[in-house]
Amino acid sequence: MADHATLIDEANLETAAPGPAALETASAPLVRGKWLKNDMPRERLIEQGASVLSDTELIVLILGSGLPGHDVFDVARTLLDRFGSLRAMLDATYTDFADLRGIGPAKKTQLLAIMEMARRSLVDKMRMRSLINSPEAVENYLRLRIGGRPQEIFVSLFLDARHRLIRCEESAQGTLTRMAVYPREIVRRALSLNAASLIVAHNHPSGAVQPSASDCRLTHTLRDALTLIDVQLVDHLVIGTDSVYSFARAGWP
């Protein structure tokens, strides 16, 4: 079993241009002072459901109002422009909101609390089901957890004998294009958690999901190392902006 780190390097991949900032998805106009009652976000949510609202409108309902002199819709748009998407906002910390004008500490912490609730609800759902039979749930969770991160993150999902989640951990962090992953440490962690199987994943901040040569080397090294302790590597997922690459579905190239 090798001691050295496997370096994941995305630099040799063709990078995709970052997607545009989140756009309005609902048809109602967001023009200050020109709202009809039936176009108000709160009324539309009550009458039609939350799914009809745009990302901006959802944030507006959470914020309620801006500070004096700051329109709440402008604040919501600024948030989306800064992070690019609601998904990317899930990874925000209080520091990321520190210089944001228009909302105070109470609203900033409220936003962070709601985002954390979304993450935890996904983890709870995964703990109650066999992840072997729920690949979509795993991919959705990983998109939310690491899909919008500006640096490469390597995540390990340790599973029990019934393929239920024991723990999800960030095993390594890197830069925009590379990171060092130590297979030996992941194997040790699998042993300490008495895991029967494992799903690993990492993101490509460029948005492209095609695995690099180093991604393939790491996958084979980790798979061989886990086989020695009778732990199955179920899959290695590469998380991009809008898609996911599965080594298992691709036949473990």
UniProtKB/Swiss-Prot annotation:
One of its GO terms (biological process) is proteolysis. Zn(2+) binds at H202, H204, D215. The keyword Hydrolase applies. A motif (JAMM motif) lies at residues 202-215. CDD domains: MPN_DUF2466. InterPro entries: MPN (IPR037518), RadC_JAB (IPR025657), RuvA_2-like (IPR010994), UPF0758 (IPR001405), UPF0758_CS (IPR020891), UPF0758_N (IPR046778). This is UPF0758 protein Bxeno_A3578. It comes from Paraburkholderia xenovorans (strain LB400). Residues 131-253 form the MPN domain. GO terms for molecular function: metal ion binding; metallopeptidase activity. Keywords: Hydrolase, Metal-binding, Metalloprotease, Protease, Zinc. Gene3D superfamilies: 5' to 3' exonuclease, C-terminal subdomain, Cytidine Deaminase, domain 2. Belongs to the UPF0758 family. It comes from the Bacteria.
